[in-house]
From Swiss-Prot:
Keywords: Cytoplasm, Metal-binding, NAD, Oxidoreductase, Zinc. This is Alcohol dehydrogenase 2. Its cofactor is Zn(2+). It comes from Oryza sativa subsp. japonica. It is an enzyme of class 1 (oxidoreductase).
């Protein structure tokens, strides 16, 4: 492309400080360096993680910053050493990478790349410790190696999944974080068998994606657990057969669930990050074969407390990161599930706005009115 090797000026939504509305600014995006790729973003979605680090409550504030990590785009140019991607390729940026060379990447059991694992505090490129974004010469920090709230961004090649160019980027863009995290937690880690019972704790976008995994796995009963009763109606679209609000019961929710299922759930997936929900998720599964999977991220001071007899009675507790998907290896296959109409991504996308209205997307999520709001970069 004619822009290869040159600085590109484009629009980006800059977070200048915590909790303040994002500002659409003209930024300069430098060419990609070794093992980097410059991507033209066509669609980007808002994930709760973006909101979390924009609020910066209890987090290291890294500002000014370009947030965003769920997106779909096209390769504009590649840096030295990049052989797997070429200009014109369709890609999904991912907040965690796959170098394909470390012990984790070589292991069939792990997706936690040593080199490119998520780093929320690093606001620069891993290669040279510098930003590729500037405004009038002043550096603007990156976010989790992706920074997709920009018409162009620079990303390490290991954090880009090359996908089928026929796949609609305005739909499959949501696969690059939340959906895959929840869906993979069920199908790759909990692995319910056809006819089994599954409980999902937390019915936000990640929880509903986990529920979709249970539905496609043929679960006979899917119990949604949430403190907001308004979420049950929406959850029915994702296969939810029963709804439990812990506030409606005088006894602990795990006891309620054990009674409902004649001894406990076959599988349970926790998607809230609340430590009490995590413990309940484990304690509600059936002894002998029950499997609980933790997806939500707890606070740094949380401690998981349960009686050791739960383990001796052969209940299994697992954790997962990004649904146990290796980004470059596995995401193209998840895209193909959508192309074969086995995944229904449309029901997760509740809103769509032009990129210029990005603050509307933040408002919708803060009010709890959206699952995913996709922003169109060309408007």
């Amino acid at each position: 492309m004619a822009t290869a090797g040159k600085v590109i000026k484009c629009k980006a939504a800059v977070a200048w400080e915590a909790g303040k509305p994002l500002s659409i600014e003209e930024v300069e995006v430098a060419p990609p360096q070794a093992m980097e790729v410059r991507v033209k973003i066509l669609y980007t979605a808002l994930c709760h993680t973006d909101v979390y680090f924009w609020e910066a409550k209890g987090q290291t504030p890294v500002f000014p910053r370009i947030l965003g990590h769920e997106a779909g785009g096209i390769v504009e140019s590649v840096g030295e050493g990049v052989t797997e991607l070429a200009p014109g390729d369709h890609v999904l940026p991912v907040f965690t990478g796959e170098c394909k060379e470390c012990d984790h990447c070589k292991s069939e059991e792990s997706n936690m790349c040593d080199l490119l694992r998520i780093n929320v505090d690093r606001g620069v490129m891993i290669g040279d410790g510098k930003s590729r974004f500037t405004i009038k010469g002043k550096p603007i920090f990156h976010f989790v190696g992706t920074s997709t709230f920009s018409e162009y961004t620079v990303i390490h090649v290991g954090c880009l999944a090359k996908i089928n160019p026929e796949a609609p980027l305005d739909k499959v863009c949501i696969l690059s974080c939340g959906f895959s995290t929840g869906f993979g937690a069920t199908v790759n880690v909990a692995k319910p068998k056809k006819g089994q019972t599954v409980a999902i704790f937390g019915l936000g976008a990640v929880g509903l994606a986990a529920m979709e995994g249970a539905r496609l796995s043929g679960a006979s009963r899917i119990i949604g657990v949430d403190l907001n009763p308004a979420k049950f109606e929406q959850a029915k679209k994702f296969g939810c057969t029963d709804f439990v609000n812990p506030k409606d019961h005088s006894k602990p929710v795990h006891e309620v669930l054990i009674e409902m299922t004649n001894g406990g759930l076959d599988r349970a997936v926790e998607c809230t990050g609340n430590i009490n929900a995590m413990i309940s998720c484990f304690e509600c599964v059936h002894d002998g074969w029950g499997v609980a999977v933790l997806v939500g991220v707890p606070t740094k001071d949380d401690v998981f407390k349960t009686h050791p007899m739960n383990f001796l009675n052969e209940k299994t507790l697992k954790g997962t990161f990004f649904g146990n998907y290796k980004p470059r290896t596995d995401l193209p296959n998840v895209v193909e599930l959508y192309m074969k109409k086995e995944l229904e991504l449309e029901k997760f996308i509740t809103h769509s706005v032009p990129f210029s209205e990005i603050n509307t997307a933040f408002d919708l999520m803060l009010k709890g009115e959206s699952l995913r709001c996709v922003m169109r970069m060309d408007e």
